């Protein structure tokens, strides 16, 4: 799967994305999804891995999905959640767009991808 950087990132989308990960449990969930990469994780696996109650996890996954930082896909009777690397890279690009104030940055052109 190709990991493009979302170059059409708006301030509103940046705020929504940052708000989604500005909560400790959601940040931990998002980081676990990033580590899982393309294979993703089921809510059950996430709940067990992070020791989070399923009802609480459901709320956090809904918020991450709404923000665009995560997506879900039905696989049989399970939902598989994945980090949206294009959205994550778009957020990073938006935040660092003017980081070097005109000088060349050493940031990787391709951004972050699944391990």
Residue ranges and their predicted role:
Residues 61-62:
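Short, hydrophobic-biased segments on the C-terminal half of alpha helices
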Residues 48, 65-66:
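Alpha-helical residues within the helix-turn-helix
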Residues 9-53, 75-87:
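N-terminal helix-turn-helix DNA-binding core of bacterial DNA-binding proteins
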Residues 1-13, 34-35, 85-115:
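Amphipathic alpha-helical dimerization/coiled-coil segments
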């Amino acid at each position: 799967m190709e990991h493009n950087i979302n170059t059409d990132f708006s301030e509103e989308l940046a705020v929504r994305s940052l708000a989604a990960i500005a909560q400790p449990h959601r940040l931990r969930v998002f980081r676990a999804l990033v580590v899982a990469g393309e294979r993703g994780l089921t809510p059950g696996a996430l709940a067990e891995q992070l020791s989070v109650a399923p009802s609480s996890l459901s709320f956090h996954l809904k918020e991450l999905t709404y923000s665009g930082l995560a997506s879900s896909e039905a696989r049989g009777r399970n939902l598989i959640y994945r980090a949206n690397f294009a959205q994550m890279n778009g957020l990073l690009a938006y935040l660092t767009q003017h980081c070097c104030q005109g000088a060349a940055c050493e940031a990787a052109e391709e951004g972050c991808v699944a391990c």
